[in-house]
Amino acid sequence: TTLFRSDVILEVLRKYKEQGREFETVCCIYSTAPFVTPERLREAYGKMNSEIDSVFTCVAYSYPIQRSLHIVDGKISMVYPEYKNARSQDLEPIYHDAGQFYFSRTAPFVESRTFWGENTAGLVLSELEVQDLDTQTDWALAEMKYELLHK
């Protein structure tokens, strides 16, 4: 059986509720996120209000995905050919989940069973603050970014 992040957090919240403890907010921090800081956690927490139920970290793709390519049967072509002549600096930034942490007001989280509801905001990070850790190369990049951040 695969347990998802939300299932685990819902179970923890249920166990605490059984013990008479309830929380207004919940935060999930990934153990593989080496650049999480107290300042960024406070910043994300501060974004939640009457209109925002959840906040998670995101980062812009390093190159516009509008100019992305795919290879089919050995031939390369643009995914979005309408952007063939567009300058990369003129294209809208597109973001992806940075996989660091997720904040939510507890009641909407329990109701929707997700950190990503319709009232979710993103906390945009710089590329220096984000590094996936799946390979040895990823680890080496994280070390280099750490050095740059702490000069």
Stretch-by-stretch model annotation:
Residues 2-3:
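Short, small-residue-biased leader/transition segments that mark boundaries at the very start
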Residues 7, 94-151:
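Conserved alpha/beta core of the MobA/IspD/sugar-nucleotide pyrophosphorylase nucleotidyltransferase superfamily
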Residues 7-12, 40-43, 47, 141:
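Alpha-helical elements of Rossmann-like donor-binding domains used by nucleotide-donor carbohydrate transfer enzymes
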Residues 14-20:
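Phosphate/pyrophosphate-binding loops at sites that engage ATP/ADP/AMP, CoA/4′-phosphopantetheine
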Residues 21-32:
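Short beta-strand-to-loop acidic/aromatic patch adjacent to the donor-nucleotide binding site
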Residues 32, 54-57, 105, 135:
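Generic structural signal for small/hydrophobic residues in well-ordered secondary structure
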Residues 38-65, 72-75:
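Basic phosphate/pyrophosphate-binding loop/patch that engages nucleotide-derived ligands
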Residues 74-93:
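Short, flexible, basic/aromatic active-site loop/helix in glycosyltransferases
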